């Protein structure tokens, strides 16, 4: 059962440590996983790890043509190696969030290393894009625990997980499979995770957007699906 609790929409989540590897989280904790169903918004989010530009240009062009804005979780490494695409993201008005610098499993790092991953990425984004990533971050691979969340929170970051995994990271992912999964399971309030390096997601995007439009749903940012003003990228 999906529910929203206040504006922050914080829910208890026991989930996988990565999209492809099930791992029981031994300790309950709260994080943002789902938005407000009454908003009529589905938040499409795109992660950029250490891969190249991938299909990012195609995704940005599709969104630009339709006047849509999403949230992109960017690693500092990706921004450093794709400065023109990174600057286009800001120029197009998208919400920018933090995905660490070099995409490590944060649960394996010391507190100081976690802080460095987040703070240095924010500095890179500021230097290259003229934007900031606070208050949102997404742990690489979805790997997080109570300590990671507490350390991130002390640095001004709130974890944004997802309620629907597109499956675009699978080795044999196809546009049909990605579109089919999203359209079968998506509901207003969902936070959907996709990846800028996925050709399958880029090719599926027009199909997904057309069907959302037919259903009367709107695509928006994390801030919008949470009923908040756009806090990140400022």
Q: Language-model segments: what does each one mean?
A:
Residues 49, 75-77, 101, 140-142, ...:
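Active-site beta-loop-alpha junctions enriched in small/polar residues
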Residues 127-144, 148-152:
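Basic- and aromatic-lined ligand-binding clefts that recognize polyanionic substrates
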Residues 143-185, 217-228:
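His/Asp/Glu-enriched short active-site or ligand-binding loop at hydrolase and phosphoryl-transfer sites
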């Amino acid at each position: 059962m999906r529910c929203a609790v206040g504006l922050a929409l914080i829910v208890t989540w026991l989930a996988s440590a990565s999209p492809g590897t099930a791992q029981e989280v031994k300790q309950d904790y709260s994080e943002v996983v789902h938005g407000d169903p009454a908003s009529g918004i589905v938040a499409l989010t795109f992660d950029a790890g250490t891969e190249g530009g991938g299909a990012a240009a195609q995704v940005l062009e599709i969104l630009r043509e339709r006047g849509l804005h999403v949230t992109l979780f960017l690693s500092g490494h990706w921004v450093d190696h794709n400065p023109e695409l990174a600057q286009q993201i800001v120029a197009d008005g998208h919400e920018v969030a933090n995905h660490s610098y070099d995409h490590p499993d944060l649960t394996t790092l010391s507190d100081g290393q976690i802080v460095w991953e987040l703070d240095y990425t924010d500095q890179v984004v500021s230097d290259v894009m003229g934007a900031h990533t606070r208050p949102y971050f997404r742990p690489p691979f979805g790997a997080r625990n109570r300590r990671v969340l507490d350390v991130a929170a002390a640095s001004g970051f709130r974890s944004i997980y997802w309620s629907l995994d597109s499956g675009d990271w699978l080795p044999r992912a196809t546009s049909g499979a990605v579109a089919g999964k999203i359209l079968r399971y998506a509901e207003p309030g969902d936070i959907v995770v996709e990846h800028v390096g996925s050709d399958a997601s880029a090719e599926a995007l027009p199909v997904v957007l057309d069907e959302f439009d037919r259903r009367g749903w709107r695509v928006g940012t994390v801030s919008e699906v949470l009923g908040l003003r756009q806090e990140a990228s400022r």
